[in-house]
A protein has these predicted regions:
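Nucleic-acid endonuclease domains
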Residues: 1-134
Length: 134
């Protein structure tokens, strides 16, 4: 696992995941563009990197490995809650991270009520796990 120090970018989105993606993309490419503008099977949010942050949806259902197999990304970036560091992981590291820090929830009834996995809120245990492997 590697880390990338992120550049500061004025916030354009209330949604934390969209802001995390935009900050990471700006750091990596210098571009400021609309977040969530690519389907998850397109290979990644920025190049071959799928970018996530705390409380992000990991996958529909509970099969993380199946999602990894079809999402098209080669690397996974977790942006910390202060938007200052992105932890860059390969698929095996991402699977371990998502398995440890994912939780099963349901979509709202208005959205069909399907089961999905989300990352937990960032806490001390998650931060220590990331730092120990970076």
């Amino acid at each position: 696992m590697n880390t990338i120090e992120l550049k500061e970018l004025p916030r354009q989105y209330k949604n934390n995941g969209q802001h995390a993606e935009q900050v990471a993309r700006y750091t990596l490419t210098g571009e400021v563009c609309k977040a969530d503008n690519k389907p998850f099977t397109a290979g990644g949010d920025c190049g071959d990197i799928q970018i996530k942050s705390a409380r992000a949806t990991i996958c529909r259902g509970t099969d993380i490995k199946a999602h990894i197999a079809i999402d098209g990304a080669k690397r996974y970036g977790y942006v910390n809650s202060s938007y200052t560091v992105m932890y860059l992981m390969n698929a095996d590291e991402w699977f371990e991270f998502a398995s440890l820090f994912g939780t099963v929830t349901r979509e709202s009834k208005a959205n069909g009520g399907a089961i999905k996995m989300r990352l937990k809120a960032e806490g001390r245990e998650m931060t220590e796990w990331l730092r120990a492997r970076a």
